[in-house]
Amino acid sequence: MARIPLLLALLLAVSAAAAAQVGGNRGHGPLVGGWSPITDVGDPHIQELGGWAVERHASLSSDGLRFRRVTSGEQQVVSGMNYRLVVSASDPAGATASYVAVVYEQSWTNTRQLTSFKPAAAH
């Protein structure tokens, strides 16, 4: 008879632990697979990623875009990190526009890929 309350207590403890895993990540770092805002876009690494993305795009498209700065962004934890960066860039005539660059980076393998680069309006 004492087994039933013990089993119920165990079941309740397991359920509470599972619920904490599902909803307990609020405010405790990025959720794996979910996008979270980059709080400090002025961070030198974020600015360097934005510059690299514009340079990579310009080398592939020959449109002459020049990096100005990262204005906002999000990050996504995957097997490495995806960065969705809103960058300000200017064309050869000096006109400035915003673009959305998605960069995949895996620091332990020195991997960096530009997976997307579009005008911000198309984002």
From Swiss-Prot:
Family recorded in the similarity comment: Belongs to the cystatin family. Phytocystatin subfamily.
Domain of life: Eukaryota
Location of the protein in the cell: Secreted
Lineage of origin: Eukaryota, Viridiplantae, Streptophyta, Embryophyta, Tracheophyta
Keyword terms of this UniProt record: Plant defense, Protease inhibitor, Secreted, Signal, Thiol protease inhibitor
Domain Cystatin: start-end pairs: 33-91
Biological-process GO terms, alphabetical: defense response
Main location: secreted
Name of this chain's protein: Cysteine proteinase inhibitor 8
Entry's Gene Ontology cellular component terms: extracellular region
Signal peptide, first to last residue: 1-19
Alphabetized Gene3D superfamilies for the sequence: 3.10.450.10
SUPFAM superfamilies: Cystatin/monellin
UniProt keyword Signal present: yes
Role description: Specific inhibitor of cysteine proteinases. Probably involved in the regulation of endogenous processes and in defense against pests and pathogens.
Motif (Secondary area of contact): 76-80
Pfam families reported in the protein's UniProt record: SQAPI (PF16845)
Keyword hit for Secreted: yes
Site positions (Reactive site): G33
Coiled coil: none
CDD domains: CY
